[in-house]
C-alpha cells in the first residue's frame, strides 16, 4: 500500500512540474534543461516502477504461498522513496539554474546538486537488491499465506489456496 500511495503523491508532483512546462514562456526557459529530466522521471519512476512494486507486494503471497517480511518490505519502500527523491528532486533546481541536458560534462556550479542526485540514484539502485532478497526469502519459505491474506480481496483468485494449484478450477466457478 505504501508504494501505491507514494505513486499517487509522486505522480502528482511530476504532473505539477508538467503544468509548468505547458506554459510557453516558462517552457522556453526550461526546454532542454534538467528540469525536463526531473519532470519526466517524476512521472515515469513512480508511474511504472512504484506501481510494479505495489502489485508485486500484493501478489507475492499468492504467487509463492508465503508471506513476505513486512519490516523488510517497509525498509525497501523507504529506501526507494528517499533514493528516488534524492536522485530526481535536485534536478528541478539544476534545470532552473540552466543546466542543459545531453552534455558530457557540466559546469562546476552544478557539482553539488549532481552529487546529491548521484547518491540518491545509488541508494535507489541498492534498495532494489533488498527487493530481490525479499522475493528470494518469500520463495524459499516463511509464514504460510492464507488463500485470502488481504482484507477486501474478493475476486475468484482469492478463493483458491496460495499458491494457486495447476488446473485451478476443475469445474467452472459460480460467480455471484
Task: Report each predicted region and the residues it spans.
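Interfacial and helix-entry/exit segments of alpha-helical transmembrane bundles
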Residues: 1-18, 34-37, 42-46, 50-89, ...
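Core, highly hydrophobic multi-pass alpha-helical transmembrane subunits of bioenergetic inner membranes
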Residues: 15-16, 76, 92, 108-115, ...
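Active-site proximal loops enriched in glycine and acidic residues that flank catalytic Cys/His/Asp
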Residues: 24, 44-46, 83, 90, ...
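Transmembrane alpha-helical segments in integral membrane proteins
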Residues: 52-62, 124-141
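Extramembrane terminal tails and long inter-domain/linker segments of multi-pass membrane proteins
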Residues: 97-109, 136-176
Amino acid at each position: 500500500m505504501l508504494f501505491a500511495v507514494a505513486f499517487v503523491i509522486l505522480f502528482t508532483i511530476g504532473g505539477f512540474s508538467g503544468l509548468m512546462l505547458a506554459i510557453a514562456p516558462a517552457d522556453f526557459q526550461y526546454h532542454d534543461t534538467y528540469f525536463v529530466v526531473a519532470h519526466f522521471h517524476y512521472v515515469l519512476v513512480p508511474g511504472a516502477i512504484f506501481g510494479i512494486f505495489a502489485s508485486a507486494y500484493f501478489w507475492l503471497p499468492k504467487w509463492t504461498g508465503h508471506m513476505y517480511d513486512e519490516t523488510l518490505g517497509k525498509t525497501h519502500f523507504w529506501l526507494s522513496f528517499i533514493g528516488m527523491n534524492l536522485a530526481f528532486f535536485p534536478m528541478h533546481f539544476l534545470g532552473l539554474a540552466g543546466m542543459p541536458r545531453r552534455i558530457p560534462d557540466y559546469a562546476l556550479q552544478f557539482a553539488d546538486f549532481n552529487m546529491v542526485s548521484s547518491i540518491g540514484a545509488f541508494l535507489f539502485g541498492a534498495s532494489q537488491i533488498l527487493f530481490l532478497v525479499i522475493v528470494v526469502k518469500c520463495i524459499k519459505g516463511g509464514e504460510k499465506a492464507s488463500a485470502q491474506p488481504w482484507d477486501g480481496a474478493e475476486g475468484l483468485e482469492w478463493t483458491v489456496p496460495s499458491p494457486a494449484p495447476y488446473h485451478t478450477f476443475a469445474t467452472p466457478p459460480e460467480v455471484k
